[in-house]
Curated annotation (Swiss-Prot):
It catalyses: oxaloacetate + acetyl-CoA + H2O = citrate + CoA + H(+). The gene is gltA. Its EC number is 2.3.3.16. Allosterically inhibited by NADH. This is Citrate synthase. It comes from the Bacteria. It comes from Coxiella burnetii (strain RSA 493 / Nine Mile phase I).
Length: 430
């Protein structure tokens, strides 16, 4: 219980609410009993509302800090791999050697999907968006795994989480292969998580190929950097769906649906499209001028962030990774990448961008990196969903194990008509 109180006065009454202090971040006022006093709180978009208590991820947007279970994101990207980060997000601690080996082995045992699942793809139109295919097949997995759908059992919840993390790259790669008319590639247990994904994306049955280690490491970092980001729109969607008692496959499918929205998961694709629109280095000045004009609808994508008012901590890691990939594939001198590097330099030196703290964000570099690897832009959000699956399922597991777990039921400020009588059709005015 909290000894500190916040007092709210309204309608000739004064009500006290407990104030809770987090281990990091701003204090939280618990107003859940406000409705008992004849009023509700209005916070459109939840920008000042903590909808849950969580121990998973912390963000300080003012200072440019992102922590997974207390570990800085740049250290995890440098010293760990995605499988370690998955273990960390799910269980709260980084694994030791034995724990990691067991976890990786378990993931690899669940990477394959039923043959009936692969037949789902034949029902999609030839030009279906990969996100539509992934969303549908993830939701359909609940039809195949009845053995672990008792969400009241921790062991069932854990097994479902493992299956989702393991099968997501397989289904993501299948969505890409189907979209380009190539045969599916089966996962190979000898490869690590990122290598396996690249193998299933770009491999063919006609030749044995090994993914470039630089590209595999880059993909692993992309997975790490996008693994979780606190209570964003898609994570909140997963939690709300989970609060109803829906199975985890349905909940993750709901999260994918939310992520598909261009305001959430499409930023790196939008950034790449912007670069193509600018077209040439000689046009940068014109578009910089447009970006500074409040009356111009043009927005410079990939710069600044809704949460981070400082440098996005993921961007520094992604910048380094981007340059490593460009070196590995020899694409530094292609017009698109030369344009991006020039734009980055101008933005980092221009007083307007410095004053507004419009630094290049993770989306600016991740879109370039994925493009350099050879991944088309319609797969960018799929890869985002693949990366974020562990974050979603970790939040779902945390919520399901919480004694405060309850059905989400927001209120509203109703501004519609007051009660009125129904008039028969023949008496209604034209």
């Amino acid at each position: 219980m909290s000894n500190r109180k916040a007092k709210l006065s309204f309608e000739n009454q004064s009500v006290e609410f407990p104030i809770y202090s987090p281990t990091l971040g701003k204090d939280v006022i618990d107003v859940k009993t406000l409705g008992n006093h004849g009023a509700y709180a209005l916070d459109v978009g939840f920008y000042s509302t903590a909808a849950c208590e969580s121990k998973i991820t912390f963000i300080d947007g003012e200072k440019g800090i992102l922590l997974y279970r207390g570990y800085p994101i740049d250290q995890l990207a440098d010293k760990s791999d995605y499988m370690e980060v998955c273990y960390l997000l799910m269980y709260g601690e980084l694994p030791n050697k034995g724990e990691k080996e067991k976890f990786v082995r378990t993931i690899k045992e669940h990477t394959s999907v039923y043959e009936q699942v692969t037949k789902f793809f034949n029902g999609f139109h030839y030009d279906a968006h990969p996100m539509a295919m992934v969303l549908s097949t993830i939701g359909a997995l609940s039809a195949f795994y009845h053995d672990a759908l008792d969400i009241t059992k921790p062991a069932d919840r854990e097994l479902s989480a493992i299956r989702l993390i393991a099968k997501m790259p397989t289904l993501a790669a299948m969505s890409y292969k189907y979209s380009i008319g190539q045969p599916f590639m089966h996962p190979r247990r000898a490869m690590n998580y990122a290598e396996n994904f690249l193998h299933m994306l770009f491999g063919t049955p006609y030749e044995e190929t090994e993914p470039d280690p630089v590209l595999a490491r880059a993909m692993d970092r992309i997975f790490i950097l996008h693994a979780d980001h606190e209570q964003n729109a898609s994570t909140t969607t997963v939690r709300v769906a989970g609060s109803t008692g829906a199975n985890p496959f349905a909940c993750i499918s709901a999260g994918i649906s939310a992520l598909w929205g261009p305001a959430h998961g499409g930023a790196n694709e939008a950034c790449l499209n912007m670069l193509r629109k600018i077209g040439d280095e000689k046009n940068i000045g014109q578009y910089i001028k447009k970006a500074k004009d409040k009356n111009d609808p043009f927005r410079l994508m990939g710069f600044g962030h809704r949460v981070y008012k400082n440098y996005d901590p993921r961007a520094k890691v992604m910048q380094k990774t981007c340059y490593e990939v460009l070196d590995a594939v020899g694409r530094h001198n292609e017009p698109l990448f030369k344009l991006a590097i020039k734009l980055e330099k101008i933005a980092l030196e221009d007083d307007y961008f410095i004053e507004k703290k419009l630094y290049p964000n993770v989306d600016f570099y991740s879109g370039l990196t994925l493009n350099a690897i050879g991944i088309p832009s319609n797969m960018f959000t799929v890869i985002f969903a693949l990366s974020r699956t562990v974050g979603w399922i970790s939040h779902w597991m945390e919520m399901m194990s919480s004694p405060d777990h309850r059905l989400a039921r927001p209120r509203q400020l109703y501004t519609g008509e007051t009660e009125r009588e129904v008039i028969s059709l023949d008496k209604r005015q034209a």
